C-alpha cells in the first residue's frame, strides 16, 4: 500500500495576544496531527489542538537555537511524508522574517503540498497596542518593515541607509535591541535628525508588554536603563509623537505575570477577568477529558430517582449524550435537578430544565460527575453515582509552562478554590513551585482555604472580589515603589 503524503500549513500565530489568531489558523490547529511551534507563538493557541496532536518545540533565542533550521526542514518533510497533517506555527506572520521560504522550498523538493495562512505581524500590532498607528495622513504616508540582523558574522544589517533615512517616514525594525545603537548612528549619519522620536516595544500585545520612548540620540541609554531586551519592535519617525493614549499599557494589571491553578472541573471565570485587566496569564495544569463507558444499569432506572445532582457542566453534557446514545426518552427523567457550579446550572437551563437548590443526601439521589468528583463524594454520601468522564492532566503543556516561567518569573500564584489549592500542594513541584515558603517562591493567594494558608504561608481571602482587590492593590504598590 502506497502512503499518501500529508500536508503542511504554515500558520501565522500573530504577535502574542491569542485573540489575534485568524479563523483559518484556528481551523488548521484543530485539524493538525503534529504542530511545530516557535518561541513567540503563544502556547494558549495549542489548546485548539486535538488531544492526540503531537507538539514539537522549535524555539530560537538570540545566539541559542533549540533546533537548527535544517532540522526543522527535515522534520516537516518527515512528518508530511508519513501522511500527517502538519502545522508549522510561527510567531507573527510566517512570511515576515520567518524563514518560511526555506521551509517551503524543502517541502517543494519532496513534492509535499503546503498552504500559507497569514498572521498579524508584530511590526504593525505592537505599535498599535502602544497607541501608535504606523501610518497617519498628517505624519506618515509610508512605512517600512526591516530586519535588524543579517547573515553576516557581525550580524548588523546591510541596508540602503540613505534611502531609509530620506524616503520612508516610519521605520519599523524587528528584533533590533542588540543593534539599536548601530541603527541610530547609521540613520543620523545619513541625514535623520538626532531628535527624531523612537519607541521600543518589548513583548508587544502580550500582558508583559513594556515600552520606552526617546530619540535617535538617547534611546539606547533609555533602553539600557529600563532593561528592555528582545523580543522587541523599534519604531522610528514622527508618528511616535502621535501617541496620545497607550490604551493597552494603561490596563490595571499590565506587566503582571500571574498563574491561576486549575483543578479539572468547571473552571472559574477569574482567569478571563485577569486577562481582560491586562495580566500575562498562565493556567496550570492543562487538562484533557477521557469519557467513561455508558453505565446502562443506572440509565435504565433513571425514572426512579427523585434528585439528580451534577458536579460540572461537562457532567451535564456527557450524561445527556449517554441518554441519547441509549435512546432513552428524556421525559423519563422526572427528578429535581441541581448543580454544583454556575456553568452546570447554565447548561441545564439551556436544555430547558429548572434547576433547584441542592437536595440532602438520600437513596433516591443520583450524583453525576467526573471520576474525581464522584470518588470524593462517595466517602460521605449513600446515594447512587454515575461517572461520566475522567479529567487527566495533559502533559504536553508541562514543558512549555516550565519554559514560560523560567523566561518570565511569576509575580503571583492564584488558587480560586480548595480543589486548586490541593492541586498546587500535590503537583506544584512539577513546574518548580513548592508550596513551602522560600525566598524563590512567588506569593500564593487562595480563596477559602484558611488551613492551607496557615500551614504554607499562603494569603487567604474569602471572596473573589476580595481576591481581585488584593491583586490590584499589590500591583499598584509595586508600580509606586518602582516609580
Curated annotation (Swiss-Prot):
Cross-referenced PROSITE patterns: SUMT_1, SUMT_2
Catalysed reactions, semicolon-separated: uroporphyrinogen III + 2 S-adenosyl-L-methionine = precorrin-2 + 2 S-adenosyl-L-homocysteine + H(+)
EC number: 2.1.1.107
Keywords: Methyltransferase, Porphyrin biosynthesis, S-adenosyl-L-methionine, Transferase
Keyword ATP-binding found: no
GO molecular function: uroporphyrin-III C-methyltransferase activity; uroporphyrinogen-III synthase activity
Keyword Methyltransferase on entry: yes
Pfam families on file: HEM4, TP_methylase
Enzyme class: transferase
Inducing stimuli: Positively regulated by TnrA under nitrogen-limited conditions.
GO biological process: methylation; siroheme biosynthetic process
Protein family: Belongs to the precorrin methyltransferase family.
Protein name: Uroporphyrinogen-III C-methyltransferase
Organism for this UniProt entry: Bacillus subtilis (strain 168)
Lineage, opening ranks: Bacteria, Bacillati, Bacillota, Bacilli, Bacillales
Gene: nasF
Amino acid at each position: 500500500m502506497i502512503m499518501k503524503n500529508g500536508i503542511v500549513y504554515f500558520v501565522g500565530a500573530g504577535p502574542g495576544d491569542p485573540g489575534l489568531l485568524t479563523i483559518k489558523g484556528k481551523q488548521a490547529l484543530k485539524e493538525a496531527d503534529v504542530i511545530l511551534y516557535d518561541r513567540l507563538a503563544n502556547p494558549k493557541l495549542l489548546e485548539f489542538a486535538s488531544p492526540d496532536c503531537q507538539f514539537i518545540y522549535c524555539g530560537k533565542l538570540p545566539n541559542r537555537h533549540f533546533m537548527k533550521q535544517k532540522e526543522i526542514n527535515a522534520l516537516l518533510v518527515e512528518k508530511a511524508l508519513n501522511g500527517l497533517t502538519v502545522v508549522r506555527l510561527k510567531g507573527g506572520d510566517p512570511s515576515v522574517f520567518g524563514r518560511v521560504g526555506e521551509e517551503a522550498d524543502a517541502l517543494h523538493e519532496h513534492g509535499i503540498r503546503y498552504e500559507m495562512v497569514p498572521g498579524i505581524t508584530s511590526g504593525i500590532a505592537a505599535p498599535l497596542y502602544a497607541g501608535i498607528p504606523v501610518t497617519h495622513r498628517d505624519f506618515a504616508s509610508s512605512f517600512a518593515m526591516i530586519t535588524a540582523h543579517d547573515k553576516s558574522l557581525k550580524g548588523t544589517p546591510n541596508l540602503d541607509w540613505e534611502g531609509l533615512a530620506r524616503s520612508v517616514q516610519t521605520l519599523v525594525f524587528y528584533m533590533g535591541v542588540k543593534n539599536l545603537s548601530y541603527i541610530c548612528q547609521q540613520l543620523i549619519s545619513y541625514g535623520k535628525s538626532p531628535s527624531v522620536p523612537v519607541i521600543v516595544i518589548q513583548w508587544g500585545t502580550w500582558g508583559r508588554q513594556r515600552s520606552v520612548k526617546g530619540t535617535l540620540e538617547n534611546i539606547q541609554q533609555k533602553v539600557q536603563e529600563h532593561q528592555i531586551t528582545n523580543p522587541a519592535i523599534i519604531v522610528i519617525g514622527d508618528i511616535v509623537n502621535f501617541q496620545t493614549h497607550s490604551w493597552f499599557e494603561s490596563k490595571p494589571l499590565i506587566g503582571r505575570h500571574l498563574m491561576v491553578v486549575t483543578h479539572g472541573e468547571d473552571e472559574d471565570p477569574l482567569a478571563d477577568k485577569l486577562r481582560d485587566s491586562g495580566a500575562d496569564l498562565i493556567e496550570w495544569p492543562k487538562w484533557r477529558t477521557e469519557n467513561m463507558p455508558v453505565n446502562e444499569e443506572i440509565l435504565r432506572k433513571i425514572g426512579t430517582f427523585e434528585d439528580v445532582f451534577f458536579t460540572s457542566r461537562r457532567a451535564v453534557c456527557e450524561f445527556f449524550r449517554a441518554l441519547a446514545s441509549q435512546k432513552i426518552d428524556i421525559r423519563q427523567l422526572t427528578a429535581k435537578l441541581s448543580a454544583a457550579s454556575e456553568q452546570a446550572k447554565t447548561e441545564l437551563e439551556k436544555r430547558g430544565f429548572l434547576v433547584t437548590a441542592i437536595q440532602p443526601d438520600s437513596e433516591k439521589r443520583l450524583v453525576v460527575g467526573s471520576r474525581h468528583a464522584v470518588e470524593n463524594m462517595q466517602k460521605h454520601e449513600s446515594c447512587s453515582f454515575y461517572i461520566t468522564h475522567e479529567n487527566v492532566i495533559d502533559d504536553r503543556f508541562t514543558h512549555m509552562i516550565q519554559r514560560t516561567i523560567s523566561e518570565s518569573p511569576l509575580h503571583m500564584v492564584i488558587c480560586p478554590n480548595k480543589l486548586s489549592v490541593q492541586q498546587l500542594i500535590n503537583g506544584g513541584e512539577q513546574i518548580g513551585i513548592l508550596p513551602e515558603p522560600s525566598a524563590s517562591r512567588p506569593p500564593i493567594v487562595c480563596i477559602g482555604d484558611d488551613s492551607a494558608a496557615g500551614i504554607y504561608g499562603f494569603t487567604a481571602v474569602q471572596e473573589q472580589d476580595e481576591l481581585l482587590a488584593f491583586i490590584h492593590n499589590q500591583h499598584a504598590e509595586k508600580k509606586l515603589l518602582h516609580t
